[in-house]
Amino acid sequence: MVKLKIIFHIDEPNNWPMVLESLKNVLNNAKETNRKYELEVLANSMAVFQLRELIARNTHLIDKIIEPAEQGVVFAVCNNSLNKFNISKDELFSFCKVVPAGIIELAEKQSEGYLYIKP
């Protein structure tokens, strides 16, 4: 079976539950079918706020974010968005990967064969 590479793009805070549910479904499928995946979530614009650990704790998203990260899902965060909203990298979960520009990360991943999903 071919390994699927998927990048989920999120730029609106209200879409986090849908993205995290989609991730959960893909990870469950991986367990059930032994299919291999490379998964990344790219957060930019206002969606970066939910990757601040304190905010995630207060919105009850923390477990739904930590579980996929522990299973190898990459959470990439746009540095341009962090700068725009004056968010320090230190406020993010330690597993977050800060990328210079979200749009470039999306383009690079798509050129590497990642499927683009924007719930």
Model-identified regions with their sequence ranges:
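Domain-start "cap" segments at the beginnings of catalytic or binding domains
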Residues: 1-7, 118
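Short, glycine-rich nucleotide/cofactor-binding loops
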Residues: 8-20, 54-55
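Active-site-proximal loop/turn and secondary-structure-junction residues that shape catalytic pockets
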Residues: 12, 45-47, 81
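Early exported N-terminus immediately downstream of N-terminal targeting peptides
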Residues: 6-10, 38-40
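A cross-taxonomic marker for long C-terminal extensions/tails that follow the last structured domain
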Residues: 52-119
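Short internal beta-strands
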Residues: 39-44, 76-79
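Histidine-anchored nucleotide/phosphate-binding helix
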Residues: 19-34
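Short helix-terminating capping/connector loops at secondary-structure junctions
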Residues: 1, 32-37
